[in-house]
């Protein structure tokens, strides 16, 4: 099981595909893990690995990665990723992130353009909004444990690996705190993203709204988008037959 010591973390990651292939780093969303097909890329990673050297990362506090800092921000997660890219000597990479993972990809495009060849942003925002805040207010771990014990147990199974039992509750609190105040990028920030960007969203996504996607499409100089009809937040999971080929086509055109 590969771990990398970066940014004071024991960061868990896995690799698929040819070792000499062009690197494609896949980032899961909040509460996701490498083996999660809804919050992560588990359903598409193997098909991507037929062509690319795929690196899947578990963010700080998630899955098998620890988080000694006791809090998390998107900048932290961007720094963690940059540290892994440097440690593995990957050079400039293609990044594809779901939800919060998409925000991390945007962060890297802004702060580490030297490491970012393209970004694929699935169901992510450039600025937090009332819909995110309303959902975050429902994510009380103690209430979840009472109302949906099976869901709470599954979340614990995924995120307490190698940690104290019940660590998943603190992770959930950290996710909520981060998303209530971040991200806060302006249109001026978006205009500074120099790499090609593919923006993917379901038309019914209440979090990554079409308004936010339209703003990013308009302001990021080399952006294109894919809006999938009758799809929600986990659009990659609901319609892998649409999202997967489009991601591969986008990366191939920008390699």
What is the predicted function of each stretch?
Residues 174-189:
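Active-site nucleophile elbow and catalytic-triad environment of alpha/beta-hydrolase enzymes
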Residues 75-93:
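Conserved acidic catalytic loop of the alpha/beta-hydrolase fold
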Residues 103-111, 115-151:
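Flexible "cap/lid" loop of the alpha/beta hydrolase fold
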Residues 223-224, 229-255:
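Catalytic active-site module of serine/aspartate enzymes centered on a nucleophile-bearing elbow/loop
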Residues 193, 199-201:
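Short beta-strand/loop motif that positions the catalytic acidic residue
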Residues 7-66:
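Conserved HGGG/HGGXW glycine-rich cap/lid loop of the alpha/beta-hydrolase fold
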């Amino acid at each position: 099981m590969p771990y990398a010591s970066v940014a004071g973390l024991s960061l868990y990651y896995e690799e698929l595909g040819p070792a000499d292939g062009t690197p494609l780093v896949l980032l899961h969303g909040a509460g996701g893990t490498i083996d999660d097909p809804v919050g992560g890329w588990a359903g598409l990673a193997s098909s991507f690995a037929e062509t690319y050297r795929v690196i899947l990362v578990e963010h700080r506090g998630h899955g098998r990665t620890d988080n000694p800092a006791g809090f998390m921000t998107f900048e932290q997660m961007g720094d963690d990723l940059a540290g892994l890219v440097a440690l593995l000597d990957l050079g400039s990479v293609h990044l594809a992130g779901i939800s919060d993972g998409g925000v991390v990809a945007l962060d890297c495009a802004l702060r580490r353009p030297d490491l970012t060849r393209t970004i694929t942003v699935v169901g992510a925002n450039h600025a937090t909004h009332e819909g995110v805040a309303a959902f975050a207010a429902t994510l009380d771990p103690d209430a979840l444990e009472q109302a949906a014990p099976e869901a709470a147990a599954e979340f614990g199974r995924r995120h307490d690996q190698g940690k104290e039992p019940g660590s998943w509750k603190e992770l959930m609190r950290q996710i909520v705190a981060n998303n209530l105040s971040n991200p806060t990028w302006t249109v001026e920030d978006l205009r500074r993203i120099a790499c090609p960007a593919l923006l993917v969203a379901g038309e019914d996504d209440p979090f990554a709204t079409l308004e936010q996607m339209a703003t990013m499409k308009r302001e990021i100089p080399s952006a294109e988008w894919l809006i999938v009809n009758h799809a929600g937040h986990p659009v990659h999971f609901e319609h892998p037959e649409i999202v997967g080929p489009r991601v591969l086509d986008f990366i191939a055109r920008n390699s």
